[in-house]
Design a protein with these regions (language model features):
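Short coil/turn connectors at secondary-structure junctions
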Residues: 3-6, 26-28, 42-45, 168
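Short, solvent-exposed amphipathic alpha-helical segments in soluble enzyme
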Residues: 24-25, 49-50, 163-167
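Active-site C-terminal subdomain of aminotransferase-like
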Residues: 36-125
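General beta-strand structural signal in soluble alpha/beta enzymes
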Residues: 8-12, 31-34, 41, 172-174
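Catalytic PLP-binding core of fold-type I/II PLP enzymes
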Residues: 1-23
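Conserved active-site segment immediately N-terminal to the catalytic lysine
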Residues: 24-36
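Conserved C-terminal alpha-helix-loop-beta "cap" of PLP-dependent enzymes
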Residues: 129, 133-180
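Conserved hydrophobic/aromatic beta-strand scaffold that supports enzyme active sites
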Residues: 30, 45-49, 146-148
C-alpha cells in the first residue's frame, strides 16, 4: 500500500473501544468508527483519526471537494480553531455521551474491556458448538465483538431472529448484501 503512495484506511466501526488499536505503530493513515458499537454510546457520531501523512494529503489536494458534507479540508480547519469556519452545529449531547463512554472504558481499564469482549466471544462460541452452529469467519480473522453465524440449511434466519427477540429479548442483525 505505502510503496504506491496510497493511504492505509482502517474501518473500526465495530472494534474501536473493544480492541487495542495501535494507529501509529501499525502505520494507519486514517481510521473511522461509530459510537454505537464497542464505545457503548448512542449512534450519531463518527470518530475519525488521521496521521500526519493523511493530513498532508488533504492539505495538498489540488482539486476542490465537490461536496460540502465531507469536505475534510474544511473540517480540519474547523478543528484547528485558528479561524471560525461554520461547518455544522456540534451535537453537544452526543459529545457528552462519548466523553462518558470513554471515561467508562478508562474506569474499567482497556485490558479489562478487551478481555471482557474476548470472554463473551468464547462463551458464545462454546454454546454455538454445543448447538452444532458454526461461525462464518475463520478463527484467525474473527473480531471477538462481531460474530457471524452460518444458518443451517433448511432454517429461516428471520424466524430464528424473531424468536430470539420475542422469547429472550436478544436482537441480532441479519446479513448484508449477498450474505443476507
Amino acid at each position: 500500500v505505502k510503496e504506491n503512495g496510497a493511504l492505509y484506511l482502517v474501518d473500526c466501526v465495530t472494534s474501536l473501544g473493544g480492541l487495542n488499536l495501535r494507529m501509529d505503530e501499525w502505520h494507519i493513515d486514517a481510521l473511522y468508527s461509530g459510537t454505537q458499537k464497542c464505545l457503548s454510546c448512542p449512534p450519531g457520531l463518527s470518530p475519525v483519526s488521521f496521521s500526519k501523512n493523511a493530513l498532508k494529503k488533504l492539505s495538498d489536494r489540488s482539486t476542490k471537494v465537490p461536496n460540502w458534507y465531507l469536505d475534510l479540508s474544511m473540517i480540519t480547519k474547523y478543528w484547528s480553531g485558528n479561524s471560525r469556519a461554520y461547518h455544522h452545529t456540534a451535537p453537544i449531547n452526543m459529545l457528552y455521551g462519548l466523553y462518558q463512554a470513554c471515561f467508562n472504558i478508562m474506569d474499567e481499564g482497556m485490558n479489562n474491556v478487551i478481555n471482557r469482549h474476548m470472554e463473551m466471544h468464547l462463551e458464545l462460541k462454546k454454546e454455538l458448538d454445543q448447538l452444532n452452529l458454526k461461525l462464518f469467519v475463520a478463527k484467525e480473522y474473527r473480531l471477538p465483538m462481531l460474530n457471524s453465524i452460518i444458518i443451517p440449511e433448511g432454517k429461516n434466519d428471520l424466524e430464528i431472529r424473531s424468536r430470539l427477540l420475542k422469547e429472550f429479548n436478544i436482537e441480532i442483525g441479519g446479513g448484508l448484501g449477498p450474505l443476507a
